Amino acid sequence: MSQTHKHAIPANIADRCLINPEQYETKYKQSINDPDTFWGEQGKILDWITPYQKVKNTSFAPGNVSIKWYEDGTLNLAANCLDRHLQENGDRTAIIWEGDDTSQSKHISYRELHRDVCRFANTLLDLGIKKGDVVAIYMPMVPEAAVAMLACARIGAVHSVIFGGFSPEAVAGRIIDSSSRLVITADEGVRAGRSIPLKKNVDDALKNPNVTSVEHVIVLKRTGSDIDWQEGRDLWWRDLIEKASPEHQPEAMNAEDPLFILYTSGSTGKPKGVLHTTGGYLVYAATTFKYVFDYHPGDIYWCTADVGWVTGHSYLLYGPLACGATTLMFEGVPNWPTPARMCQVVDKHQVNILYTAPTAIRALMAEGDKAIEGTDRSSLRILGSVGEPINPEAWEWYWKKIGKEKCPVVDTWWQTETGGFMITPLPGAIELKAGSATRPFFGVQPALVDNEGHPQEGATEGNLVITDSWPGQARTLFGDHERFEQTYFSTFKNMYFSGDGARRDEDGYYWITGRVDDVLNVSGHRLGTAEIESALVAHPKIAEAAVVGIPHAIKGQAIYAYVTLNHGEEPSPELYAEVRNWVRKEIGPLATPDVLHWTDSLPKTRSGKIMRRILRKIAAGDTSNLGDTSTLADPGVVEKLLEEKQAIAMPS
């Protein structure tokens, strides 16, 4: 259970680490026993306009879930990420941008980024955007995406970043739910040599009759391709920024003022707008960034995540910039145009800290030594993994091949809702085990409970909960606090339920075992099965659908959809392709089912509930123990599904 082999802390890390094993134990104990003192001290990592007196004011009690940190303090996120660095480090590179095309890259200093953010902040104000308004950002991985986010934070507008891979329908849904007043996009995005029609997708999204709040669309010229233009509504980024003043005084924000909404998949269909506020979130992003990556001034840091995900918010931009770091933003993909691209970028920019996803690691691992061919990688000091549990084989390959057996791998477990790292090694403090997220970060109190909510002691397995609040915790779901309580605090009373299962070994190390609810993890991205099922049954020929995840060598999980057609409809290769494209259009390429399993009926209980447990086992080819099928209305369905499964070609 524990995988006994531990990787010791390398001498070069131990010699200069920010936190050693003794300090970890001492600080962790203090953070749990006296969170007010501990987090009161950590809050000083930021500059405050009005210093806080209160630190923690939180409740997980049923019907009274309330989370407030530093609630009487005021600050500005952009001032903490930019202005305060100007005097001593204005000429330090804030963002290294590496384009999709290997010949394109640029360095943007803190002073230049500050100037651009001030200009764009003034642009937003000129367009009538004010504190509390929601701005939707649907951008490629270009520095202007960071400028837009920081400018929103500077004036107190709430940003809602939408991943560039989402479809027009998904974009519309997020704009409607958040009542966004402005959309910021580009003519096109570029990824692995292909262009992505971002402006066209926005145009299509805004045709939805329920989108009534958007007044303007700001468009960045990325490729220069022809796009449709709506006079009066659409505005060019460059025209606006050229006439805007580079002087802007940042808005004083209360620590509990909203900073951003980020939509994440739920198990019940409609995506949830996770709301983070300003003070506690930034304290947590900066503190976790500093200690987990053992950040030293001058380090070059690269997080491969897209800005459209929480990792891009906390650990591509806000955490690093709050610490005055140099952060690398990459427009492309790790294995294009050659499998060695990621390592080439590491060498080109002399990256010291690399933070990427198991999906990328497994894709490179499949290429063997081609992934490292002709590269040196000796600048690397720390490696990190994010997005899903990393399997021990991929962990060992990453450590051995990319890090040359000298770089600790920080395998970080956290979520959109947690704002920052929850369970993670600290490089100089915790010995590593391949595949384990190891120990909790300061102030984080994990527990494993059984299905009745009873805490399980010692080496055990169970539902992963957190028993007390931490500063980076999401405060609510936008416009739906009731759903927030229902989703995270109703399963187990007085605890935050992560939706993940985990096991703890005899050393107290945590091993994440994956979702225990109906949320899939595809290439590190969360997708709700209900969301995909809703898209499937919206197809005119489909009567019913059930979606489950199956193990996939590269993506972690693949999407397996059981589909029942309307009476009189017949399966065909044409319909197979049509249904997959339909889901792609409704949600986005990420949600495209890998397998469609045509069937006449699904296993249901007498009350009509679909038995997903059985569907998961059949899809994964695990038929050794299907459990009790006596509660099924028609137990014969299972045999039929098993027969059909034999004829299905599975994705490799």
UniProtKB/Swiss-Prot annotation:
Monomer. Its cofactor is Mg(2+). GO terms for molecular function: acetate-CoA ligase activity; AMP binding; ATP binding; metal ion binding. The record marks D517 as: Hinge residue important for conformational flexibility. This is Acetyl-coenzyme A synthetase. Belongs to the ATP-dependent AMP-binding enzyme family. The keyword Ribosomal protein does not apply. Changing G524L: No acetyl-coenzyme A synthetase activity. ATP binds at G387, E388, P389, D411, T412, W413, W414, Q415, T416, D500, R515, R526.
